[in-house]
């Protein structure tokens, strides 16, 4: 069994994690996931009741997503107004040992919460606080939790889509399907996160660095489903690639992509997705559609992608969703407008990462580009309905990945 909680901007990430755990064969209790504006937010007592149900075993998996510090978390009711409604690490330790039992022994816990993985030495606390100085990492280790994955810094999300820490933890949940150990699952979740980025931002590197694994990396998680022989880390096409020799381009593999584009309307504006995949989310930039194609080729290494043809249409008067990384509450996040620059500057990117099956390469395509207007924050969203591209390959021994710089281009009319 598994328990997933969340509220405010973490609710969509919690729902994504719950759905992926369910797909992996787990029975998931999602009753503590509160959508923004819920009329009955869950309390600290409700969470403790779910973690330590009377007469029943503690869930084997728990993703308790909330606002944290290193030794307490805020309930959904606390987030809604009662700031005193906390669950402390000391309370959890007491419940875990009640009646001489070890109710958290062998469990797997992970969270999107801020500083939930910050291990603070007891000597730093001192004084009267020394007796209750135990942080989450220390407390859960003493309770014999097998695995605890949490952030040493701020957990970061987005109010309009599943992004940053939310997305990483959802990927981790997906890989807890019995095909990998708990340590491998986090390793490959981070790899898959990086491999799916059309553009890498500082917040991406931050969340990858601070998501910390405590416990036994070789611990395995069993599920109710038939264990897969391999674990799929990323949603992408995986057709075999056979590069051919072009007299001008050398080894190349041509592709034509016709993404299915879907408009999403939110309180913050509009954005599009491609092929039902998560969009490209980059801090302080308009959210863009994104789709991914595996371009892994045996014995060859992709060095870049060359766009050869485009078919597009424009949507005018669009107020885009401009990504503002959220660390506190959705309401406290500043409102950001788009500027008059076009984003993204490049719509195709080759990523190289490690999957459970070995080295993987993907063509990450962002079939959209927004050009803003500074006076009211609206602008033109260009959407690419058809994209022709060639992925260029070299031998693995070739270490030159520097793209050529085009300083000038001229056009000539047809004769």
Language model features with spans:
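Cysteine-dependent hydrolase recognition
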Residues: 1-415
């Amino acid at each position: 069994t598994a328990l997933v909680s969340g509220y405010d901007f973490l609710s969509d990430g919690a729902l994504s994690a719950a759905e992926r755990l369910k797909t992996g064969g787990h029975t998931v209790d999602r009753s503590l996931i509160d959508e923004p504006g819920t009329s009955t937010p869950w309390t600290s007592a409700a969470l403790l009741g779910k973690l330590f149900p009377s007469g029943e075993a503690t869930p084997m998996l728990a993703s308790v997503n909330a606002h944290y510090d290193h030794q307490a978390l805020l309930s959904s009711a606390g987030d809604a107004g009662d700031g005193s409604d906390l669950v402390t690490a000391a309370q959890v330790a007491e419940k875990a040992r009640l009646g001489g039992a070890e109710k958290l022994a062998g469990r797997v816990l992970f969270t999107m919460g801020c500083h939930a993985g910050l291990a603070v030495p007891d000597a730093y606390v001192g004084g009267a606080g020394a007796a209750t100085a135990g942080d989450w990492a220390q407390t859960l280790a003493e309770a014999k939790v097998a695995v605890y994955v949490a952030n040493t810094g701020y957990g970061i999300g987005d109010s309009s889509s599943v992004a940053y820490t939310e997305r990483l933890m959802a990927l981790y949940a997906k890989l807890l399907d019995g095909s990998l150990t708990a340590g491998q699952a986090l390793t490959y979740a981070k790899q898959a996160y990086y491999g799916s980025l059309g553009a890498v931002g500082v917040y991406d590197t931050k969340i990858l660095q601070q998501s910390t694994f405590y416990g036994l990396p070789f611990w395995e998680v069993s599920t109710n489903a038939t264990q897969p022989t391999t674990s799929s880390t990323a949603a992408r096409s995986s057709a075999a690639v056979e590069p051919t020799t072009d007299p001008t381009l050398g080894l190349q593999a041509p592709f034509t992509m016709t993404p299915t584009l879907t408009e999403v309307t939110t309180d913050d504006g509009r954005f599009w997705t491609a092929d039902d995949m998560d969009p490209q989310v980059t801090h302080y930039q308009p959210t863009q559609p994104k789709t991914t194609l595996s371009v892994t080729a045996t014995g060859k290494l992709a060095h870049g992608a060359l766009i050869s043809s485009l078919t597009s249409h424009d949507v005018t008067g669009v107020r885009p969703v401009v990504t503002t990384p959220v660390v506190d509450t959705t309401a406290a996040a500043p409102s950001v407008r788009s500027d008059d620059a076009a984003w993204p500057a490049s719509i195709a990117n080759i990523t190289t990462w490690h999957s459970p099956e070995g080295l993987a390469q993907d063509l990450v395509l962002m079939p959209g580009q927004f050009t803003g207007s500074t006076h009211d924050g609206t602008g033109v969203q260009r959407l690419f309905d058809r994209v022709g591209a060639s992925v260029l390959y070299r031998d693995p021994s070739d270490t030159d990945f520097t793209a050529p710089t085009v300083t000038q281009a001229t056009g000539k009319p047809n004769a």
